[in-house]
Amino acid sequence: MIDPSSSFDRIKKEARLLREQLHVHNINYHVKDDPVISDGEYDRMMQRLIAIETQFPELSTPDSPTRRIGAKALTAFETAEHAIPMQSLDNAFSDQDVIDFHNRTAKILNTSDIRYTVEPKLDGVAVELRYEQGSLTLALTRGDGTMGEVITDNARTIPSVPLKLAPAGNGTIPDVLEVRGEVIINSKDFEGLNKKRLATGEPLFANPRNAAAGSLRQLDSRVTAKRPLEIFVYGVGRAQELMANFDIGSHSALLESLKRLGFRINPLIRSGLSLTEVLDRFKAFETMRQDLDYEIDGMVIKVDDIVFQERLGTKARSPRWAIAYKFPAMEETTVINDIIVQVGRTGTLTPVAILEPVNIGGVMVARASLHNQDEIQNKDIRINDTVLVKRAGDVIPKVVKPVTALRTGSERVFVMPTHCPVCHSPVRRLDNEAAVKCINASCKAQLKQRLKHFVSKGGFDMEGLGTKLIDQLVDRTLVGSFADLFTLDRETLAAMDRMGEKSATNIVQAIERSKRIPLKRFLFALGMAHTGESAAQLLSSTFFTLEALLKASAEALGAIEGVGPKTADSVVAFFANPDNQETIARMMENGVVIENHTVVESAALDNATFFSEKRVVLTGTLGTLTRSEAKQRLEEQGARVVSSVSKNTDILVAGEASGSKLVKARSLGVTIMDEQTFLEHLDRG
C-alpha cells in the first residue's frame, strides 16, 4: 500500500531508485553468481515496485524488472528481420575434421599460428536480443536465420536477460546493440517441470531443449514467466559501436565486454588455445558432460582474432571462422521388440524394454528400463513401437517417447502382470507408490538380486562371486541367505559350471578376507530399502556401532539430516524382522566382524583433520579426482559428505562448472573452496 501522504515526485524517485537497485541485484545474482542481498530483501523490493507501478501505471517503464512477471497474452507471434543473419555452423564429428578446419583456416590466413576460443555447445534455443540506449526493445528467435519470431515479452521474463544494460568500461552504453545467446532449462529444473506437468495431466516434454522452445513460444508471457529459463550469451549481431568503444580485437575480449555490460557468459569458455589444446578441451567436455547442470551436445570452436574472422568471412549459411565439434549422437530411434519384467532385491517388478540393438554414443544399447506401469501409460509406450532412446554420459539408456507417426497398427499395449514372473506369487501395489511388488520374501529372483548387491564392491566386496555363479548357487539351493555365503567351501564351488580348483580357491580366500567389514559397508550390503551408500554412511557416523543402531527408534533415525522417514521406517522394520536377526547372528557365528565406526575412522577421530566432523558438499567437475574418489577421501578424514546445500553445510567444494549449489552456498554464507585449496587440505590430512 502506498502512503497517500507521499508526494508524486517522491514516489517517482523511489520507483526509479528501486528499478536501478533491482537491475544491479539481478546482475549480481544471475550473471555474477554473487548476490549481496538476501532473497527476502530482493522480494520485498520487487513487491514495493509492483505496488507503486500498480497504483501509478504511468511510472512503469519498458525496462522495469516487474516486466519479468509477464504481459497480457498475444493472439499470434509477429516476425521481424535480423539485421545481420543468424547463420548456422558447419559440423565436425572427429579430431580429423577439426584438423582439416584448422588447415583450411591456416591456408586462407597464410599462417598456422591461430588461437581459438572454445565454448560448450548448449542444447537450447538460439535468440537475439536488441538493446537501444541500453534498454531491451526486441527479442527474436533464430527462425530461418533471416526472419525470427518476436518474443520480447517472453524474453523479459527470463531472470538472466538484462532489461537494462550496466555502464561499463568508459561508462558508455551503445545506442544499438544486438547480442545472441542460447536459452536453456537446466536438467534439475526440467525434471521438476515435468513432475508438475505429470501431476496436472499435461503432456511431458521430451527433453530440456523442447521445454525451452515450448516455453519461449507461449503466446501468454505469464506462462513463460513460470518456466525456469536462463540464458548464456555467446556473440553479437549489430555491435559496431560496442567494438569501437571498447577497442575490441578478439572474440574473448568481446565476451568480457558483454559480461561487464551485465550479460551472462558461460564459465566454461576458454580462449587463446592452440589446435592441440582445442582437441584436449573437447575431451575434457566429454568427461565433464554428465556432471553439468545442463545439457550440451558438443563444443563450438571460434577463431579468436577479430581481424582474422573478417578476413575469413562467411559462406552462404555459415561463417568460415567457426565450427561445431559435435559429440556422438546420444539419441537414436529403434524398435521395442518386447517388454519383459525383472524382479529386484526388494521385490519391485520393473518393466524392461527389449530393443532392436542400436549404437548410441559408441555403445550398443539393447534394453532400457521403463521403470513402472505409470511411466509406460503416461508416455503411451507399446510393444513394437518405434521409440526415441536417449543415453547421456554413463547414464542408463532411457526411452524418451514413442514416434507415434510411425505406428503401423501392430503395436500392443503392455499390462503389468498380477503375479510374480519368477515365483508366481501375487503382486501388490503399495499406497502412494508407483512400484508393484512381489510380496513373497522367499522369491528366488529377489534373493539373487539381494546376494549380488551384498557381494558388490560397496558391500562385502567378494571378488569372483559374479552374477552367473550366484544364479547357480541359488538355483541349486546351496545358498538361501547372506549367511550361507560364509559356509561355502572350495569343493562346493569347484563343482559349479565353468569353475576350476584355482578359481574356487580364490573365491574362498575372497570370502575370508571380506569377513572384516566397516559398519557403513555392512549396512549398505544388507540392501535395506531406501538405504544407499550415503544413508549407510550417515547411520554409521551417527550411531558408531550396530548395537546402538539396533536400539534407535524410527523417530531418532528420521531426525538425522539426510535420512528421511522412508529410510528410517525401512531400517527399523528390517532389524525387527526375526529372519533378518537370525541371518545376522549366523553371519557373526561364521566369523563376520563388524568394525565400529570409531575403529574404522580412528585416524580421523583421534587425529582431527581439517575436515573432521564437517558437512561437505561437492559440486562441479574436479580435474584430478572423480566425485566418488573425492567423497572417499573426505570420509577417510572424518567429513560427512552430503548432497545438498543448507544452512548446516560447512564447506562447498566448487569444481569446474559449478551451478546452483554455488549460488545457494554464497547466499547462505557457506565456506567455498576451490579445487586447489581442497587438495591442499586433503594432503595435509
UniProtKB/Swiss-Prot annotation:
Every BRCT domain range: 606-685
Known catalytic reactions: NAD(+) + (deoxyribonucleotide)n-3'-hydroxyl + 5'-phospho-(deoxyribonucleotide)m = (deoxyribonucleotide)n+m + AMP + beta-nicotinamide D-nucleotide
GO biological-process terms attached to the record: DNA repair; DNA replication
Keywords: DNA damage, DNA repair, DNA replication, Ligase, Magnesium, Manganese, Metal-binding, NAD, Zinc
Cofactors: Mg(2+); Mn(2+)
Positions of NAD(+) binding: D39, G40, E41, Y42, D43, S88, L89, E119, R142, E182, K302, K326
Active site: K121
Pfam families: BRCT (PF00533), DNA_ligase_aden (PF01653), DNA_ligase_OB (PF03120), DNA_ligase_ZBD (PF03119), HHH_2 (PF12826), HHH_5 (PF14520), Nlig-Ia (PF22745)
Entry EC number(s): 6.5.1.2
Source domain of life: Bacteria
First-tier enzyme category under EC: ligase
Family the entry assigns: Belongs to the NAD-dependent DNA ligase family. LigA subfamily.
Function: DNA ligase that catalyzes the formation of phosphodiester linkages between 5'-phosphoryl and 3'-hydroxyl groups in double-stranded DNA using NAD as a coenzyme and as the energy source for the reaction. It is essential for DNA replication and repair of damaged DNA.
Identification of the protein by name: DNA ligase
Organism: Desulforapulum autotrophicum (strain ATCC 43914 / DSM 3382 / VKM B-1955 / HRM2) (Desulfobacterium autotrophicum)
Lineage, highest ranks first: Bacteria, Pseudomonadati, Thermodesulfobacteriota, Desulfobacteria, Desulfobacterales
